[in-house]
């Protein structure tokens, strides 16, 4: 066989892995196109449309988060038991997401919304374990890059989704019609994944072991560094339950702000554009200088921005701040741009670090653990809704910011293996 023939054969796996990377990044962008627009613009519309208080609104978030957590863990099991069928599982996730949004769009009452939100959580959650597991297997030498590209797709979706939905809400459709029509592009994205990430032959007998996932889960939990990363992410997720669900509503409801849907969309879009720029840089830096600096720096910055949102009404009353002409809106916009630009970037840095410290095996199991760390976020939307109903938004964001001292301290104490 000629040298050219050998080179051509060796190039095929490389081309296939980059094809899978492009497809999974696109699928992740499609997923977050829905998620970003739903939480940023459509969830507030549901609250206003049904006349919900913050606790009732928080219940929807808690229901969705609970379903999301359960199916993330299930996704980890299937992702590691059937790694050769990752494309099918990703496609099922995207299709299920579209069906879930459609069902929410046709529900006429708040009581019926509650079970419908179980589907809202289930579809998207099934995406990450097989997708990130596949990327980790395909890119063992460039994990930081592959995971950051996966996160880059999320940022793109978070940019495009609010712009599209903001335009539709302002000019063409109401929120229920948007949710009904959303099933079509979701099914189209699922079909694309099926074509570009095809199933492959089973590689080892391990794929047939029904209980491999649970053994891998137990083995992963014996890794102390991985466990501490999971605990840090779990405590961060509690704060995310306040900021993620209630920040868009706060911008719409606060009498000193009263943002329009398009203004909310533009603000979050700008933050995610910054995130899309930062994400690959963080991935590159993580591969070069290590995970700890990026994790501690990112967590500290998110803690600062969350506290700034909560304290903004006090800060603008300080005389030197007044003299500088800084208004409440200036501070809020500044804080949200920081928070939004790092939110997904930091999460995917957690994923990359967890995959790296766990070794080569059971990547989907590790991903399900990382996303399963959101267990503390299950109840936080409802709890923070109760706090908002009693004390208002500012106290809520201050509490969420204070809580981030815990993961920041944990990350500061960790010792990661030296990058070589």
Task: Give, region by region, the residue ranges found by the protein language model.
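Juxtamembrane intracellular "pre-TM" segments in multi-pass secondary transporters
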Residues: 2-16, 200-229
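Extracytoplasmic gate region of multi-pass secondary transporters
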Residues: 38-40, 225-276
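Helix-to-loop junctions at the C-terminal end of transmembrane segments
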Residues: 71-84, 279-290, 388-389
């Amino acid at each position: 066989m000629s040298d050219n023939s050998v080179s051509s054969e060796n190039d095929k796996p490389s081309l296939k892995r980059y094809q899978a990377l492009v497809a999974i990044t696109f699928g992740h962008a499609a997923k977050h196109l829905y998620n970003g627009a739903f939480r940023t613009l459509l969830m507030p519309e549901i609250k206003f449309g049904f006349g919900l208080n913050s606790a009732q609104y928080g219940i929807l978030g808690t229901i969705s988060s609970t379903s999301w957590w359960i199916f993330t863990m299930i996704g980890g099991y299937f992702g590691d038991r059937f790694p050769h069928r990752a494309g099918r599982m990703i496609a099922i996730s995207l299709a299920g997401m579209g069906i879930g949004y459609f069902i929410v769009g046709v529900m006429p009452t708040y009581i019926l919304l509650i079970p419908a939100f179980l589907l809202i959580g289930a579809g998207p959650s099934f995406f990450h374990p097989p997708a990130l597991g596949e990327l980790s297997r395909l890119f063992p030498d460039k994990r930081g890059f592959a995971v950051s590209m996966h996160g880059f797709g999320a940022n793109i979706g978070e940019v495009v989704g609010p712009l599209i939905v903001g335009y539709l809400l302002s000019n063409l459709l109401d929120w229920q019609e948007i949710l009904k029509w959303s099933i079509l592009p979701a099914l189209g994205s699922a079909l694309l994944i099926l074509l570009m990430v095809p199933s492959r032959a089973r590689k080892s007998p391990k794929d047939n072991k029904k209980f491999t996932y649970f053994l891998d889960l137990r083995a992963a939990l014996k890794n102390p560094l991985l466990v501490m990363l999971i605990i840090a992410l779990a405590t961060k997720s509690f704060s995310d339950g306040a900021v993620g669900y209630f920040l868009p509503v706060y911008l719409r409801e606060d009498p000193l702000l009263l943002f329009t849907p398009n203004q909310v969309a533009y603000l979050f879009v700008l933050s995610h554009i910054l995130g899309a720029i930062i994400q690959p840089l963080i991935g590159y830096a993580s591969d070069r200088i290590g995970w700890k600096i990026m994790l501690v720096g990112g967590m500290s910055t998110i803690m600062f921005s969350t506290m700034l949102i909560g304290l903004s009404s006090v800060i603008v009353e300080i005389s030197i701040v007044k003299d500088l002409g800084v208004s409440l809106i200036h501070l809020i916009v500044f804080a949200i741009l920081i928070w939004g630009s790092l939110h997904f970037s930091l999460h995917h840095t957690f994923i990359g670090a967890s995959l790296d410290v766990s070794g080569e095996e059971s990547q989907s199991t590790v991903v399900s653990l990382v996303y399963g760390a959101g267990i503390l976020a299950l109840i936080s939307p409802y709890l923070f809704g109760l706090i908002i109903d009693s004390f208002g938004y500012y106290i809520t964001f201050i509490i969420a910011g204070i809580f981030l001292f815990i993961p920041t301290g944990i990350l500061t104490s960790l010792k990661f293996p030296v990058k070589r």
